[in-house]
Regions:
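Double-stranded beta-helix
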Residues: 211-240
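Catalytic core of non-heme Fe(II) oxygenases with the double-stranded beta-helix
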Residues: 108-186, 196, 202-206, 210-216, ...
Length: 240
């Protein structure tokens, strides 16, 4: 992976990095096989919000076989370290919220994955995912026609945080990014986002992106206990 970039115009981080060309090619080959065998594949279109025709499930086992899952879990730990650095740690004691997050990561897995072949004028309205962490990776991007109004939003993904009127003076609740092939973004599953449509010269352009959710069954009861007890911190030492 290349250098990590962190975008945080609101309170939760959005992690951005890129995968190697070799890895991207493996994922393109995998998704090509699925796309070419549509009659035997399971569409995820009814389960996600996108106004996109071709959206297909990926068995997480297939991603494990090509070591994609290992890379994503490592990225999840990088995300944890970023969050940890944003917390105030006093006397080497970790807030309970991070203890819960760390426990989740120790047992986390890709709970669902899918890809879509987005075509001209298709889009995905504002939505959020299920799970703990989610991500999107870009495998193929066509050449877009210029925007009619020069706003450079065609084909962009926009992340949307929470903002009050006062916060708006010193922060920005939205972040618009025009992704490139190989770009991968990781974010809390609750972070809302939307995808703009685009146009291509022949009207046959395809942008392929792969999305995934990370979750663990062992995280849920701990999270409920934490919220129910209303405990805001607990003295648990950091592990070496």
């Amino acid at each position: 992976m290349s250098d990590l970039n962190v975008y945080q115009p609101w309170s939760v981080p959005l992690l951005h990095t890129s995968l190697s060309d070799n890895f991207i090619q493996k994922l393109i080959q995998l998704t090509d096989v699925i796309a070419e065998d549509k009659e035997e594949q399971e569409s995820i279109g009814s389960e996600v919000s996108g106004e996109i025709k071709d959206e297909w499930k990926i068995d997480p086992v297939l991603l494990t076989n090509i070591k994609f899952t290992d890379n994503i879990i490592r990225l999840g730990w990088e995300y944890f370290k970023i969050v940890l650095n944003n917390f105030q740690i006093i006397d080497n004691k970790v807030p309970l919220a991070l203890v819960v997050f760390k426990s989740a990561l120790e047992n986390i897995e890709i709970s669902s994955a899918w890809f879509n072949d987005q075509k001209d004028n298709e889009y995905s309205p504002m939505h959020k995912h299920t799970g703990i962490l989610s991500g999107v990776l870009y495998l193929m991007i066509p050449e877009y026609l210029p925007s009619r109004k020069n706003k450079d939003t065609d084909g962009a993904i926009t992340f949307i945080g929470n903002e009050t009127a006062q916060e708006g003076m010193i922060s920005n609740s939205t972040l618009k990014i025009s992704p490139k092939v190989g770009d991968i973004f990781m974010f809390p599953s609750s972070l809302k986002h939307e995808v703009y449509p685009f146009r291509t010269k022949d009207g046959k352009g395809v942008r392929r992106s792969l999305s995934f959710n990370l979750n663990t069954d062992k995280f849920i009861p701990q999270a409920k206990w934490f919220l129910k007890s209303k405990i805001t911190s607990e003295n648990i030492p950091l592990e070496e």
